[in-house]
């Protein structure tokens, strides 16, 4: 199975999938449009979250970073008057140093990610969407800013006017991702932010055509008229989409076969048929590992119903 993932929402579903499927059968294609260089090192927030999840290092209270990490380097730099745009843990920083040294030595982001997965003892296939630089910028009333500045620096507070995924039209789908699509017919779009997490992946040249030839199931990150977490609602509005499960399904409709939305959502299950897809209700909140596993089992079972 191929899973398209950002750094929030989908990792909880991955937590369930890794309990019910052989790890070597999972290929996670991860958004890299939120990557940025901090203090000379390349930070890949979404990739790191997925790597830490599959290596059982993730801080499950925050669902990012490494559990029980320390912040001595960050604090020392602050003492010396050097401000970093992200609060990086010491062990987390080691990941960034290894990645950056590999890339400076001529290694691709894919190769660096495979190396990190090996160092962490991960059997699943964790891949960046592309080896080319892609960056998401958010146009706000306070000016244009990198997504990390908007979300981490400004806490997602500025009003959003638009979203620009820079470099995506010139980028290529990573070779190993293409190889995965040649071998697997089942694609799951996780409940990550459709605009800034999944959007960059499906905007890569040729990706939509690949998805049209596969069985595609998506899980909604929206319940009612609000996202489960993060700034998806504000970003969807700026892109002209209704903030609802229907709005998410419309965004994916050209390649979507089955759409899973929350059982608490009042949306009409049959209304999705006009988009050319089926819809199924489930508990999508994933408040525990057991709930994640239950949703994973439900979604995996749906693939057998797709022709």
Curated annotation (Swiss-Prot):
Q: Does the keyword Transmembrane apply?
A: no
Q: According to the UniProt record, what class of enzyme is this?
A: transferase
GO MF annotation terms = LPPG:FO 2-phospho-L-lactate transferase activity; magnesium ion binding
Q: Which UniProt keywords apply?
A: Magnesium, Transferase
Q: Which Gene3D superfamilies match?
A: CofD-like domain (1.10.8.240), CofD-like domains (3.40.50.10680)
Q: Which InterPro entries match?
A: CofD (IPR002882), CofD-like_dom_sf (IPR038136), FbiA/CofD (IPR010115)
Q: Which residues bind 7,8-didemethyl-8-hydroxy-5-deazariboflavin?
A: 48, 87
Q: Which family does it belong to?
A: Belongs to the CofD family.
Which PANTHER family does the record match to this protein? 2-PHOSPHO-L-LACTATE TRANSFERASE
Describe its assembly: Homodimer.
Protein's UniProt name: 2-phospho-L-lactate transferase
């Amino acid at each position: 199975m191929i899973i398209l993932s950002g750094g929030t929402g989908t990792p909880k579903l991955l937590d369930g999938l890794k309990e019910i499927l052989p790890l070597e059968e999972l290929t996670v294609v991860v958004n890299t449009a939120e990557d940025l260089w901090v203090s000379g090192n390349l930070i890949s927030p979404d990739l790191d979250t997925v790597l830490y999840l599959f290596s059982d290092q993730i801080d499950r209270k925050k669902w990012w970073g490494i559990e029980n990490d320390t912040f001595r380097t960050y604090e020392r730099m602050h003492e010396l008057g050097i401000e970093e745009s992200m609060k990086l843990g010491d062990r987390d920083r080691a990941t960034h140093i290894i990645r950056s040294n590999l890339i400076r030595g001529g290694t691709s982001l894919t190769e660096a990610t495979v190396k990190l997965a090996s160092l962490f003892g991960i059997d699943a296939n964790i891949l960046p969407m592309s080896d080319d630089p892609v960056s998401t910028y958010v146009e706000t009333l306070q000016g244009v800013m990198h997504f990390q500045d908007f979300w981490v620096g400004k806490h997602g507070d500025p009003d959003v006017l638009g979203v620009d995924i820079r470099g995506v039209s010139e980028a290529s789908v990573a070779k190993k991702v293409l190889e995965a699509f040649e071998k697997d017919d089942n694609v799951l779009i996780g409940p990550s932010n459709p605009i800034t997490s999944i959007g960059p992946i499906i905007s890569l040249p040729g990706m939509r055509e690949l998805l049209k030839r596969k069985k595609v199931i998506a899980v909604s990150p929206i319940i009612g008229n609000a996202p489960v977490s993060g700034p998806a609602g504000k970003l969807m509005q700026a892109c002209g989409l209704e903030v609802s499960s229907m709005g998410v399904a419309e965004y994916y409709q050209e390649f979507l076969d089955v759409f899973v939305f929350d059982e608490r959502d009042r949306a009409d299950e049959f209304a999705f048929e006009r988009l050319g897809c089926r819809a199924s209700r489930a508990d999508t909140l994933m408040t525990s590992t057991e709930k994640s596993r239950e949703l994973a089992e439900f979604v995996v079972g749906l693939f057998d119903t797709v022709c």
